[in-house]
Amino acid sequence: MNRSIINIIDGVQTSDGAGVKLRRIIGGPDLNMLDPFLLFDEFGSDNPDDYIAGFPPHPHRGFETITYMLNGKFRHKDSAGNEGLLSDGSVQWMTAGSGVIHSEMPEKTDGLVRGFQLWLNLPKKLKMIDPSYSDIPSDKIPEVDIDNGRVRVISGTYNNITGPGKPHTGVLYFDVELNQSESIEIPIDDFWNTFIYVYSGQACVGDHNILQGQLAIFSQKGLLRFSSSASSVLQCIVVSGETINEPVAR
């Protein structure tokens, strides 16, 4: 049995930080949250005016943030003394836990800045753990070559390859690329909430087409299976997480 689509979300154009322009898909008016995910943004522009002001110091508490850079550079600093530089293909994994103040500021580069940020809720018993931070360089993220494309494994396991991300709850996070008219099957635990976000091309699931900039939410049982269209290569983010089923204060 394959998972079916239960909703497709367009997201909204907005800004955050000191005016960084982005598309908010989870955490916006059409999808407040998808347990355990509190927020999912795509940020990106080839115009420095859209992102150069960055995200000055601001507080977080009680969840994890996962920032995945496709292109560009952002420098991280936080109140625990951590500092790191996000660059092409790398990931910043921060556990806010009991509380941390951090900043994410872009460094000037030629061309496009593009990436994603995901907020992962922590269960009540873990909300007051010590803050922690790790940079995952691009060359430490395994890339699984398949006949019809490739899968970057940021967290979770695909084809017996496990990603370097170490969440405190069950989470799968892949960056998938499929050639034209190809398909992929991904085993996922039952009762986990799952979505794919298309950032280039078009995904197909049965009679549904998921366009660039759209997020599709799937049912909670079965195999995740989707295809690319005949007209373009598909690039998408695949995320699935163990539900927490606890109230969230927003």
Q: Which residues make up each language-model segment?
A:
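Jelly-roll (double-stranded beta-helix
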Residues: 1-250
